[in-house]
Amino acid sequence: MSKFKVIEIKEDARPRDFEAFQLRLASPEKIKSWSYGEVKKPETINYRTLKPERDGLFCAKIFGPIRDYECLCGKYKKMRFKGVKCEKCGVEVANSKVRRSRMGHIELVTPVAHIWYVNSLPSRIGTLLGVKMKDLERVLYYEAYIVENPGDAFYDNESTKKVEYCDVLNEEQYQNLMQRYENSGFKARMGGEVVRDLLANLDLVALLNQLKEEMGATNSEAKKKTIIKRLKVVENFLNSNLNANTDSDEAVPNRPEWMMITNLPVLPPDLRPLVALDGGKFAVSDVNDLYRRVINRNTRLKKLMELDAPEIIIRNEKRMLQEAVDALFDNGRRANAVKGANKRPLKSLSEIIKGKQGRFRQNLLGKRVDFSGRSVIVVGPKLRMDQCGLPKKMALELFKPHLLAKLEEKGYATTVKQAKKMIENKTNEVWECLEEVVKGHPVMLNRAPTLHKLSIQAFHPVLVEGKAIQLHPLVCAAFNADFDGDQMAVHVPLSQEAIAECKVLMLSSMNILLPASGKSVTVPSQDMVLGIYYLSLEKAGAKGSHKICTGIDEVMMALESKCLDIHASIQTMVDGRKITTTAGRLIIKSILPDFVPENSWNKVLKKKDIAALVDYVYKQGGLEITASFLDRLKNLGFEYATKAGISISIADIIVPNDKQKAIDEAKKQVREIQNSYNLGLITSGERYNKIIDIWKSTNNVLSKEMMKLVEKDKEGFNSIYMMADSGARGSAAQISQLAAMRGLMTKPDGSIIETPIISNFREGLNVLEYFISTHGARKGLADTALKTANAGYLTRKLIDVAQNVKITIEDCGTHEGVEINEITADSSIIETLEERILGRVLAEDVIDPITNSVLFAEGTLMDEEKAKILGESGIKSVNIRTPITCKAKKGICAKCYGINLGEGKLVKPGEAVGIISAQSIGEPGTQLTLRTFHSGGTASTDLQDRQVSAQKEGFIRFYNLKTYKNKEGKNIVANRRNAAVLLVEPKIKTPFKGVINIENIHEDVIVSIKDKKQEVKYILRKYDLAKPNELAGVSGSIDGKLYLPYQSGMQVEENESIVEVIKEGWNVPNRIPFASEILVEDGEPVVQNIKAGEKGTLKFYILKGDGLDRVKNVKKGDIVKEKGFFVVIADENDREAKRHYIPRESKIEFNDSEKIDDANTIIASAPKKERKVIAEWDAYNNTIIAEIDGVVSFEDIEAGYSADEQIDEATGKRSLVINEYLPSGVRPTLVIAGKGDKAVRYHLEPKTVIFVHDGDKIAQADILAKTPKAAAKSKDITGGLPRVSELFEARKPKNAAVIAEIDGVVRFDKPLRSKERIIIQAEDGTSAEYLIDKSKHIQVRDGEFIHAGEKLTDGVVSSHDVLKILGEKALHYYLISEIQQVYRGQGVVISDKHIEVIVSQMLRQVKVVDSGHTKFIEGDLVSRRKFREENERIIRMGGEPAIAEPVLLGVTRAAIGSDSVISAASFQETTKVLTEASIAGKFDYLEDLKENVILGRMIPVGTGLYGEQNLKLKEQE
């Protein structure tokens, strides 16, 4: 750290620039040196003369003259007397601006404490003296005494309890001790003076050493905590001058007694103004009232002391003075706030700076600016993409100075006055000059709320009549603007640099891509989509069908002469090839750039296709081509939307004819279910689920019917259908509400009402139906309002935590990365690998799994083409560089960040990626749902919720899977975890019979087979093998990884598969629940119909060892009998285009070497099995089965107490159902006593139905009980926005799950104090012990093997646990997949890198575990950078470095913990931050954006990053 010089800020000369900012405590001398005189009187101004009173709060003598260069009495008036002091009124002649900077002071008769250092936790004064805050307050407010000198005083007569230094005594104790020990040196006082003396007498160095000794001596955690608290404060004081320059007087560290105020500084009067309103009233700043109270009380105290008043009166006056000063600094912090005349609390100095209306956020971070205006916006369809229409009236005002200059320059006016008059009269010359001024001078348009950088864009103004700003239709999406009365603000950039930036970076035609996802944002919407869609449709039998035309000109002529319909299918020549197309599509082709291929335009263009087209043009052609193409597209869209004349009529809404029939059928089914419920055949929950299922499916059937009808209507030219189909407006769901039925509605509590709305909007709703539907509609509106506030707050927190992240260097040189694969949730893919890898840099070579050659080298930037190749290559996971693993000292390097999505190129140094990330995550926040879902107990009817089936071909492998056979002979899953069913294909087969051996060497795994004569070895990459915790489904994905079915030392037969590629995997319990029925055997083949997928020649192969041997004698109709059969499709160059594995029992449909097309089915499966079901289970219940044979006994299960008896009327069977609400301490349990002393216990959840009786004999795999899923599921799932902020805030969830910290075997120990004890024993002998509350539902069994990171109990996984147990990379995966699930679920695309930037900021601090020789204290949270710098310093000096562990901070805590004082203070908890910083004398090196904005310096991003090198703008010759 270089030493800094303190800049003295003089009145007339402001410093040009400064490099750092330090916050310190001011000494009384310092305060006096600032002051220009003492304020003695509480008066402000004289009400008759309106002149300030002498020595009052507005005194001109102290603070300076009211008018420029004029003394108060008027003796000296003029610039020439500058610096003269008037003899009569004592005022120095100066600029009146000095009243904003000159301070005064009040000399207090007695020292008072500064409330920030008393009341802000931890109380600094209290901590230093070792006194509790409450006691300290009693001393300061004259209610108790504090011992200054204990002498030989004792509390009791036996002299055992000694009175200590700084003990606090009440009146009685004090009188008692004074009588007995006054002569032996005992002394105690009360009030501010004694506290100041005690602080002044502190020897901080001695105290520091004493505390460090105590720290070493003690073992109790609580004591350590209090000592550390004091240590921190003491160290802060001692270190508060570390960076000051040694030769200045600033070098003295802060002294504790400076926390007490003897001289109270008085704010300059213009910062607490007093303004005369008309009617003789005054608007006055509250601070003046607070100062007046202080002065009044201080003067009164002075008088009383001169009069030698009784002690009690003086004491009271001193207490009142302390209270007055407290109110001035922070009104209402202690006791009741002082209220003004209008009964509202007065605004103290603290309140002026904090909060949204405070100085920081109101005036420093956001200011009102000159040269701006606002108006309503209207659409400007004739504008170019980079233009906006600016009303002439507005332009006249905005560009007035430019215009005046132009008028003078052209000689129309000789003086400014004359020019102004011309402008007022609006003469012709004025308009001529205005046109010239505006030409080439861009303006910025902003639409509030400014959620991301595209909310402010620059345009070239076009002067228009009227008063509304005209906006180009394509930029509406970026601004989120519509024309229903939105307003926008216009700003004029003034400096040449600003104008250049607007033209080069901010012009709307430059901002075509969204920085959040890299998708184009300027995509035609609504009318434009409809026009282009209409143009691209084809109509059978239209006029002029099947004609042949030579080109676009002929087509246009034919259209104009009405002998050809625009939708007619015609043939024509395009690029020298004959193609079949329509006239409309040729018109579209005529506006496309030449490089667009036929398959992009010769089809029906819907919104998605148009978006893809725009993206393609941008990727191939760049900005300018795209911008002009978009304009042509817009014009075409509007023109044909008008010509098409599409409109809605009630006749377009077609109700299905058999609607009534379907409804009656559904009602009949509902009645049947109701009857079986009344008979007691099904439970109430099942009845509800089934009824809702019926209505759901009825609604779906009707919707499908209706869509078919609408689609057929007018040969696909039904207006409503076109709107929905093209993606212009509306959706199938909305049409079905118009034409089929409105469907099921929800109750206010989120559950579904079982009677649906049968009517549709065309028929109209009846009163009840209308009433049911209003709740949902109104809730939607209320939600939106709340959502905006929440989303805005989240954005603010994100901005604050990420504002200092910028790209600082090209490459940090790290080889570290994070392994990524596709993100899935319950078998649905949320984000594919291709999407995740796009725009990232590889951290490791990517190996092609088929050829084993390097596909992409480390350091490759993955663009769209490369990502596509990777997606098709079958690679399932890659290692990429991320901001989290970046090793740059400050910020992030370009390689770890990857592509700047806003422009599609590698990011450049100086880019403020933190802000971009925060905006990208915050901006779509308003589109997320607000609510926490109650899954109102509806069991969905999806197949995936009751079975899993194979989508690919291969054969089955069981991993650790055990099964029971039940009475019906079915196989039932016996594992609760750590098992899986895998679908694999062979990669290596044994060439001969032998013994297998597997060994790990560095990065490789060597598999060898050996018999008496020979041995073969196969080398695999360790990275490619599926890890046990991946197979068990704890982390990562296994698709495409390798699986070794045999262990070392096993005997294997010839032609056995020993290394296999996993194609699909279903783990227990996430994909296959416990007690499911398994429908496949180990090793069984799974056959599917296989399509070729590529054109070419078929060649058949068989696997031998690890290579393929050609098999030629394969004919159509053969059935495959051998493992390891492959078919390869070779292209015309005889290269492998595609390879398929053919399982046993497949039927071959083509001969060897036959030529085929990509759509041909080359392998057929057995006719009866289309999809191979692997396992299935009860969709509505979680089943509990017996794991051993034995006898059942009940615990805590009693009819009428913890359970209800239900009698099935039809069958007369009795069953017990556990009550929903149980008395505390009651845990219904089933116990099975087996052979010997073996017993298994099952805890039952509420609503469980029991199928056995006490004392029954049962067999393994019998069903004991079922818990309805709806009951298990109705726990709230936090979703949407609350889930996102929960993750970013890193909140510890209320019902956090207990998580295993090591791999090992679970053992249950004796319960301890009503808690269950679980011990996990690892293989290496280590163990971990957990105490678990009885109320939690334990999910593991005695003797099970469990992986680190798995849940032991139910509940939510806490991010902190993931970090602690599985490390930073696992946390990275967890947070990204959880957050992406929310956003993707709402259809919002955000690139991972934005989330990574925020996560890297949440991990920017570490917790010191062992401080070594550093200046840190155990338990300190310090930023990684400070930690690294300090350790490097200690190592250079040869000391012990500190050791730290990573911690995860929520975004709020991370933002407040920023290294920059100003940035933290302007975010939240302003007073606390400033209190801490002032004591430590903290430095702010002004490295980030926020503090520079506040101080008005250039921000260090973009060219500002190189501010020191002084860049000059050069004109191009």
UniProtKB/Swiss-Prot annotation:
GO biological process, one term: DNA-templated transcription
Catalysed reactions, semicolon-separated: RNA(n) + a ribonucleoside 5'-triphosphate = RNA(n+1) + diphosphate
GO cellular component, one term: DNA-directed RNA polymerase complex
Signal peptide: none
Enzyme type, top EC level: transferase
Cofactor descriptive note: Binds 1 Mg(2+) ion per subunit. Binds 2 Zn(2+) ions per subunit.
Residues given in the record as Zn(2+) 1 binding sites: 71, 73, 86, 89
UniProt-recorded Gene Ontology molecular function terms: DNA binding; DNA-directed RNA polymerase activity; magnesium ion binding; zinc ion binding
Assigned EC number: 2.7.7.6
InterPro entries per UniProt: DNA-dir_RpoC_beta_prime (IPR045867), DNA-dir_RpoC_beta_prime_bact (IPR012754), RNA_pol_asu (IPR000722), RNA_pol_N (IPR006592), RNA_pol_Rpb1_1 (IPR007080), RNA_pol_Rpb1_3 (IPR007066), RNA_pol_Rpb1_3_sf (IPR042102), RNA_pol_Rpb1_4 (IPR007083)
Domain of life per record: Bacteria
Keywords attached to this entry: DNA-directed RNA polymerase, Magnesium, Metal-binding, Nucleotidyltransferase, Transcription, Transferase, Zinc
Binding sites annotated in the UniProt record for Mg(2+): 482, 484, 486
Binding site for Zn(2+) 2: 812, 886, 893, 896
CDD domains, A to Z: RNAP_beta'_C (cd02655), RNAP_beta'_N (cd01609)
Assembly notes: The RNAP catalytic core consists of 2 alpha, 1 beta, 1 beta' and 1 omega subunit. When a sigma factor is associated with the core the holoenzyme is formed, which can initiate transcription.
Family: Belongs to the RNA polymerase beta' chain family.
NCBIfam families, A to Z: rpoC_TIGR (TIGR02386)
Function noted in UniProt: DNA-dependent RNA polymerase catalyzes the transcription of DNA into RNA using the four ribonucleoside triphosphates as substrates.
Annotated protein name in UniProt: DNA-directed RNA polymerase subunit beta'
Lineage, top ranks: Bacteria, Pseudomonadati, Campylobacterota, Epsilonproteobacteria, Campylobacterales
Gene expressing this chain: rpoC
